[in-house]
Design a protein with these regions (language model features):
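Active-site beta-loop-alpha junctions enriched in small/polar residues
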Residues: 39-40, 77
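Well-ordered alpha-helical scaffold segments within catalytic/enzyme domains
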Residues: 1-2, 40-54, 93-110, 156-173
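Low-complexity, Ser/Thr/Pro/Gly-enriched N-terminal "stalk/linker" regions
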Residues: 1-37, 48-72, 125, 132
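The feature captures the catalytic groove of carbohydrate-active enzymes
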Residues: 14, 21, 25-28, 74-75, ...
């Protein structure tokens, strides 16, 4: 049974790799869009299966496509922005992926290399935090705030900020504002 599970995991990793673009982006399907959240999910699946170099390629794509404000656009097609909305859940999820990558590889150098990307992503989301603590969902393509906090996105954002705090501690950095 264990061998069957290992074969299944490897076949899924092989499928993800077969979809990955040379840039590191992992679209939903061949010729489809890439969204930052799913790209990180796929990178974590690659880490889980031991395909670390392909996971690093996906994380580097995240670093290379991050907007100056720390966000990512909601979708890309062949590495070009397609949907210009900016989701706070997408901007923080890189921290979850990087924490998982570190746990599976213990590669502190890569964690340090990716830190600016993680930090900017979390700071983008926190820039939309409201006095009550909720973090608004995102910005429209015209940079207008989308008021409201969706439960699933908020849960992912909360987990990602916690992962970012763990990364900061491992890098001996202090991010007290992230605990608010």
């Amino acid at each position: 049974m264990l061998e069957d599970i290992q074969r299944l995991i490897q076949s899924q990793a092989d499928f993800i790799i077969s979809q990955q673009l040379p840039s590191g982006a992992i679209p939903w399907y061949r010729g489809g869009i890439t969204d930052p959240w799913d790209n990180v999910e796929c990178a974590m699946a690659l880490d889980f299966s031991g395909q670390f170099s392909e996971a690093v390629l996906a994380y580097n794509w995240m670093r290379d496509t991050q907007n100056p404000d720390g966000s990512w656009y909601s979708s890309y097609h062949n590495d070009k922005p397609q949907n210009l909305t900016k989701d706070t859940n997408f901007s923080t999820y890189i921290a979850t992926g990087m924490w998982f990558h570190y746990l599976t590889t213990q590669d502190l150098d890569f964690l340090r290399y990716m830190w600016p990307t993680v930090e900017k992503g979390i700071n983008f989301a926190l820039s939309l935090q409201q006095p009550g603590g909720e973090i608004y969902w995102g910005l429209s393509e015209n940079n207008e705030v989308w008021p409201g906090a969706i439960l699933t996105a908020s849960s992912s954002t909360w987990l990602s900020i916690k992962c970012g705090i763990k990364i900061a501690r491992n890098l001996e950095l202090d991010k007290p504002d992230w605990n608010k």
